Amino acid sequence: MGLFSFDGGKKESQPPNTRSQRKLCWESRDAFFQCLDKADILDAMDPKNSKSIKSHCKVENEKFEENCAHSWIKYFKEKRVIDFKREQTIKRIEQEAKQRERNQ
């Protein structure tokens, strides 16, 4: 410890970034997202969903937050919403294309 180092008396432990830790993180993420799907919750970052998440997916959320780095958690939650919107847009475009083909 250096003369001027200061950690505020609190150390935040980050899981090591090893292959096995990443695998554990992904498995925890998948279990949490599966629980969200069952509870019909899309956006885990929306404060409106926090009560539902606590009542339906508390254990899965705790494991996810325990096994993944904070930056990964935020990324995965945001990516879930973006991927859903992307899939919906693709479906809509495909349906519109089919409709145009039928009308010709």
UniProtKB/Swiss-Prot annotation:
Effect after changing C35A: Loss of function. Localizes correctly to the mitochondrion, but reduces the steady-state level of the protein in the mitochondrial fraction
Superkingdom of origin organism: Eukaryota
Signal peptide span: none
Effect of C68A: Loss of function. Localizes correctly to the mitochondrion, but severely reduces the steady-state level of the protein in the mitochondrial fraction
SUPFAM superfamilies: Cytochrome c oxidase subunit h
Record keywords, A-Z: Cytoplasm, Disulfide bond, Mitochondrion, Nucleus
GO MF, any single term: copper ion binding
Short motif Cx9C motif, span: 25-35
Subcellular location: Cytoplasm; Nucleus; Mitochondrion intermembrane space
Cellular component GO terms, alphabetical: cytoplasm; mitochondrial intermembrane space; mitochondrion; nucleus
Note: Present with 721 molecules/cell in log phase SD medium.
Subunit structure: Interacts with COX2.
UniProt note: domains: The Cx9C/Cx10C motifs are involved in the recognition by the mitochondrial MIA40-ERV1 disulfide relay system and the subsequent transfer of disulfide bonds by dithiol/disulfide exchange reactions to the newly imported protein.
Function: Involved in the maturation of the mitochondrial respiratory chain complex IV subunit MT-CO2/COX2. Thereby, may regulate early steps of complex IV assembly. Mitochondrial respiratory chain complex IV or cytochrome c oxidase is the component of the respiratory chain that catalyzes the transfer of electrons from intermembrane space cytochrome c to molecular oxygen in the matrix and as a consequence contributes to the proton gradient involved in mitochondrial ATP synthesis. May also be required for efficient formation of respiratory supercomplexes comprised of complexes III and IV.
The name this protein goes by in its record: Cytochrome c oxidase assembly factor 6
Organism for this UniProt entry: Saccharomyces cerevisiae (strain ATCC 204508 / S288c) (Baker's yeast)
